[in-house]
């Protein structure tokens, strides 16, 4: 079943058996084990530096023992081109401080019919999935005993379980494929400092990404994230960040609770109809920053920070929902903020310092009570009536492109 490949040639090994002292002058050691036959006996990878499971080879376990267990301090690389399948865990990893790289190649599978696909107990290193990891419980589970673990799910990769990926410790996650939670979350993160970039698809029955307990998570999304309850739930007590880039698509709202320091940043360009709101009164995002080229948010927005908590620092930002801002809105020079998208009517609370351009394109007659200051101009492009009742002291021009009336009572 297993062919071990050595750096020593056959003659050297034979002489070594006759003259053991010869091996003292020969530094080469066992290098790799190749699994080239299928087996229903659970396998333990612990003595060689590298293990390779050939294509079309299947390793199964019908009991609670993992189909393949990787442990000890000698293993540095495991490559699966075949099939690992267990009733218990498919692949168990417990390598402590030893750096380990696990590659699940395209077309390969790691699965469990009752437990977890890849169970990482203790490990530092990389899990690279180009194939399928599927399980009854967690597709991938990372225990709090691990550290410095990086998980890459490539464009051909699938990680699926009741919870797709569940991490109890800080990890780096790079997803270009699909991570799916069939009964709970696509990704569950409960502790540690996590960096997550998504260019693929993350979906869960409850939450796309669920951030809980003491996890601190930084997310950059230019892919798809969705859930039956929320796309993303920030429910930890740490300050989390969400960056939406070109290509981002959210199916469900983004909820913030438990922390007053969560933030949202927009880069690139996009259109989003999700709400970015707090779960309870007083919850929300400490800051929202537009750093991109063109973004439209048609959902509601809860901003709970102070100072310039809503900033339009570049490009064109359109808001078409109810924007509750405890602080101030700042529009910088050469940037623009549009309220309303021609069909929907936006509202904005808090102060508004406009050094660029503020555009009203409301879907109905509207009253705007926010005080406007700054050196920028105000434009109205819709055909409805706009009534300004704030204490306005902006010094820029007021330009009517459409509509019949502009009433200023402030």
Report the location of each language-model feature.
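Beta-strand-rich extracellular passenger or scaffold domains
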Residues: 32-258, 263-410
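Gram-negative bacterial Sec-dependent N-terminal signal peptides
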Residues: 1-32
């Amino acid at each position: 079943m297993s062919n071990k490949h050595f750096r020593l040639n056959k003659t050297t090994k034979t002489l070594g058996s006759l003259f053991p002292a010869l091996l003292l002058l020969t530094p080469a050691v066992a290098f790799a084990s190749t699994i080239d036959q299928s087996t229903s006996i659970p396998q333990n990878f612990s003595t060689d530096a590298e293990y390779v499971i050939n294509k079309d080879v299947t390793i199964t376990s019908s009991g609670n023992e993992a189909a393949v267990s990787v442990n000890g301090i000698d293993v540095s690389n495991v490559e699966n081109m075949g099939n690992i399948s267990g009733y218990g865990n498919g692949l168990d990893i417990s390598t402590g401080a030893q750096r380990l790289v696990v590659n699940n190649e395209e077309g390969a599978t790691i699965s469990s019919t009752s437990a977890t696909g890849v169970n990482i107990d203790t490990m530092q290193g990389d899990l690279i999935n180009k194939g399928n990891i599927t399980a009854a419980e967690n597709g991938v589970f990372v225990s709090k005993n691990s550290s410095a673990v990086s998980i890459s799910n490539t464009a051909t990769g699938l990680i699926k379980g009741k919870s797709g990926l569940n991490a109890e410790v800080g990890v780096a996650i790079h997803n270009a494929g699909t991570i799916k939670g069939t009964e709970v979350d696509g990704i569950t993160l409960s502790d540690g400092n996590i960096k997550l970039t998504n260019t693929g698809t993350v979906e869960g029955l409850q939450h796309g990404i669920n951030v809980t307990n003491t996890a601190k998570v930084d997310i950059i999304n230019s892919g798809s994230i969705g859930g039956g309850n929320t796309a993303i739930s920030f429910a930890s007590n740490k300050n989390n960040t969400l960056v939406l880039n070109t290509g981002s698509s959210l199916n469900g709202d983004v909820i913030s609770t438990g922390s007053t320091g969560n933030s949202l940043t927009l880069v690139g360009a996009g259109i989003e109809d999700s709400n970015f709101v707090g779960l309870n009164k007083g919850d929300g995002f400490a800051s929202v920053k537009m750093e991109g080229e063109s973004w439209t948010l048609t959902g509601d927005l809860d901003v709970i920070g102070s100072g310039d908590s809503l900033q339009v620092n570049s490009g064109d930002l359109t808001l078409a929902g109810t924007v509750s801002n405890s602080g101030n809105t700042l529009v910088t020079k050469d940037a623009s903020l549009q309220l309303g998208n021609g069909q929907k009517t936006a509202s904005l609370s808090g102060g508004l310092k406009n050094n660029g351009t503020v555009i009203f394109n409301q879907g109905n007659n509207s009253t705007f009570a926010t005080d406007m200051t700054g050196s920028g101009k105000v434009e109205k492009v819709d055909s409805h009536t706009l009534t300004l009742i704030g204490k306005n002291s902006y010094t820029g021009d007021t330009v009517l492109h459409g509509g019949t009336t502009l009433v200023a009572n402030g």
